[in-house]
Every structure is written in structure tokens, then in C-alpha cells.
């Protein structure tokens, strides 16, 4: 409880904090001054080592979860029983439980935690920023999660950690030479770091390829909603555009998602008799130059009958209107 000035009472009163609901309440009039307060500090927990609570001591909960660990660093820890501790279970039972837990716990995560500690040691020795440390840990996590690469104990682990730090430095444009990194890498030479750096490069390229394919679909879906909203496109066209974008993914159209989407918006709107959008307006909204949209339309024209939904327009209308606009572009180009 603390004393503040209530907005309703207009006088200093005791404010009560209800931790269950997160509300701050005036003790005089009951006015809720603040609602749904979020407590960002760590929770207080109480742990006792015996039944009589003689040495009960509050302790903070551990650190935040680690996003680079599969478990998020949420683990169960069973300690060996203390000589003075008393419990419902006997010491033999607790010892048995302790041994069983050690047999089933995830030793792979112990190894990656060891790698994170090694990276922390290296970045501290090189006086590197926490951003480098975080990126190097992310690289090691991807290395361990890749199908063809796994962490190994010993010198190889140190080489992987050193290569991850080196890669992170290059990505973030911080100058640390292989010689400097090798000096803090516990016996790992520059040749080993260079070798593991090449492996890491392949792992990251593989990961980027798999991510970009899924992100392209997600980003295109978001772009469809945003572009259609800005262009004030009718509901019928809004239904046709995402369907056309999805069908276009089945063809070898070597254009980035924005260019493909801009071209499809132009094609769909141009087929429409009532809601045509100028290519210049589409280009401004999509942040794509007009010539790029025109070239994308030309690339997609051979597949137009399979891309444009048949419920939106018949084949003759699609061919007639798109062929007409492409012919006009070519004529204007030759006449210049």
C-alpha cells in the first residue's frame, strides 16, 4: 500500500494494489485508478530446506527463457538430498529419482548450453557487443538443428563457436580478424575456424532458402490486403487477386512477390470494365516502377488463362483485354 492523491477524493489517501487483478484502488472511495497493471519484475518464490521452516529464504525465479533452446531453458532439476533435510520421501528414494532423472534428461541441450557459454567467454575476451553474442548463439542453434550438422564435444565445438563468432562479426561489419578470434578459442587455429565457417555458410544459406519460400507466401498475403485497401479495390476483385497469386506460384515466374502481386492487380483490374486502376497508381502503392509491372504482366500473360479465376472472367475477355494492353505498350515503345 502507498499514499497517493485520488482523482475522485481530491486528497492524499492510501492506494491498495490488487495483485490478482492488477488494479490500483483508492481505499477511501473505491475508485480504480489503474487497471491491469503488468508486473515485469521476477516473481518472488520461497524455498525451504526443512519442514520447520527455520531457514526459509525468498529467492528470485531464474533468468528468462532462451529462444535458441528447444525447451526454452524450461527444465526440471532434481538435486541430491542434503544430510539435514527431511522429506516425505526417504533419502534413498530421492537418490533413485535423481539417478533416473540424469538418465532421461536432454544431454544434447547440455552441449548447446556449453557452446553458448563458450561463445560468451569468447565475446567477453574480444570485448564484443551483446548483439554479436546473440547472433553467434543463433548461428550455433541453426548449426545444431540442421539435418547434416551436429555439435560435438572437444576441439570441434570450440571451432564451431569461434566460426560462429567470426560469421556474426562479418554480418554485423565488426572488424575482428581470424587471428584475434583464434587467440581466444582454446587451441583452435585459423584453418579450423575457416573450415567451420564454410560449413556455417552452407547451413545459413540452406536455412534462408527454406524460410524465404514460406515467408514469400505469408508476406504476399499481407501485401494483398494492404495494397487492395490503399487502391480501394472492390470486394469481387479482392476475392480474385489472392486466388490468382496462389495459382501463379505454380509457374516459373522469376519475379519478386511485390512485382507479381502488382502485375496481378493490374491484370485483374484491367479485365474489369468498371474499376480499372492505372498502372502508375498501382506502381506507387506497390513501390514498383511501371516498366517492372509491364514486364511482369508480359511474363505472366502466357499463363493468364490458368492464373485468372474462371469465375471472374471468361477466356475470351482475358485474352482480348490483356492482349490489347500489351500490344499498346509495344506500339508505344516502337513509336518512341
Curated annotation (Swiss-Prot):
PROSITE patterns: ZF_TFIIB (PS51134). Keywords: Metal-binding, Nucleus, Transcription, Transcription regulation, Zinc, Zinc-finger. Zn(2+) binds at residues 6, 9, 26, 29. The gene is PBRP2. Plant-specific TFIIB-related protein involved in the regulation of endosperm proliferation during the syncytial phase of endosperm development. Does not contribute to RNA polymerase IV or V activities in reproductive tissues. A zinc finger (TFIIB-type) spans 2-34. InterPro entries: Cyclin-like_sf (IPR036915), TFIIB (IPR000812), TFIIB_cyclin (IPR013150), Znf_TFIIB (IPR013137). Disruption phenotype: No visible phenotype under normal growth conditions, but embryos of mutant plants display a reduced rate of endosperm proliferation during the syncytial phase of endosperm development. This is Plant-specific TFIIB-related protein 2. It is found in: Nucleus. Gene3D superfamilies: 1.10.472.170, Cyclin-like. One of its GO terms (cellular component) is nucleus. Specifically expressed in reproductive organs and seeds. GO terms for molecular function: TBP-class protein binding; zinc ion binding. Its main location: nucleus. GO terms for biological process: endosperm development; syncytium formation by mitosis without cytokinesis; transcription preinitiation complex assembly. It comes from Arabidopsis thaliana.
Amino acid at each position: 500500500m502507498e499514499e497517493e492523491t485520488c482523482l475522485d477524493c481530491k486528497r492524499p489517501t492510501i492506494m491498495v494494489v490488487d495483485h490478482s487483478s492488477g488494479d490500483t484502488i483508492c481505499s477511501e472511495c473505491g475508485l480504480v485508478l489503474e487497471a491491469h497493471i503488468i508486473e515485469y519484475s521476477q516473481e518472488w518464490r520461497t524455498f525451504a530446506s526443512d519442514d520447520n521452516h527455520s531457514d526459509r529464504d525468498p529467492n528470485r525465479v531464474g533468468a528468462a527463457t532462451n529462444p535458441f533452446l528447444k525447451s526454452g531453458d524450461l527444465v526440471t532439476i532434481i538435486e541430491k538430498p542434503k544430510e539435514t533435510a527431511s522429506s516425505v520421501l526417504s533419502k534413498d528414494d530421492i537418490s533413485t529419482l535423481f539417478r533416473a532423472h540424469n538418465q532421461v534428461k536432454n544431454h544434447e541441450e547440455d552441449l548447446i548450453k556449453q557452446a553458448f557459454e563458450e561463445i560468451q567467454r569468447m565475446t567477453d575476451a574480444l570485448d564484443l557487443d551483446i548483439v554479436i553474442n546473440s547472433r553467434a548463439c543463433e548461428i550455433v542453434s541453426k548449426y545444431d538443428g540442421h539435418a547434416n550438422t551436429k555439435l560435438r564435444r572437444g576441439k570441434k565445438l570450440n571451432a564451431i563457436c569461434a566460426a560462429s563468432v567470426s560469421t556474426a562479426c562479418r554480418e554485423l561489419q565488426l572488424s575482428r580478424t581470424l587471428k584475434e578470434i583464434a587467440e581466444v578459442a582454446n587451441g583452435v587455429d585459423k584453418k579450423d575456424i575457416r573450415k567451420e565457417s564454410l560449413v556455417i555458410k552452407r547451413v545459413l544459406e540452406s536455412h534462408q532458402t527454406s524460410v524465404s519460400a514460406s515467408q514469400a507466401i505469408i508476406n504476399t498475403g499481407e501485401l494483398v490486403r494492404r495494397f487492395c485497401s490503399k487502391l480501394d479495390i472492390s470486394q469481387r476483385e479482392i476475392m480474385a487477386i489472392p486466388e490468382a497469386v496462389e495459382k501463379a506460384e505454380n509457374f516459373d515466374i522469376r519475379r519478386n512477390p511485390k512485382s507479381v502481386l502488382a502485375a496481378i492487380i493490374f491484370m485483374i483490374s484491367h479485365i474489369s470494365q468498371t474499376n480499372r486502376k492505372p498502372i502508375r497508381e498501382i506502381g506507387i502503392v506497390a513501390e514498383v516502377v511501371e516498366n517492372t509491372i509491364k514486364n511482369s504482366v508480359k511474363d505472366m500473360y502466357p499463363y493468364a488463362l490458368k492464373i485468372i479465376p474462371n469465375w471472374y472472367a471468361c477466356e475470351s475477355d482475358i485474352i482480348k483485354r490483356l492482349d490489347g494492353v500489351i500490344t499498346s505498350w509495344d506500339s508505344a515503345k516502337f513509336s518512341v
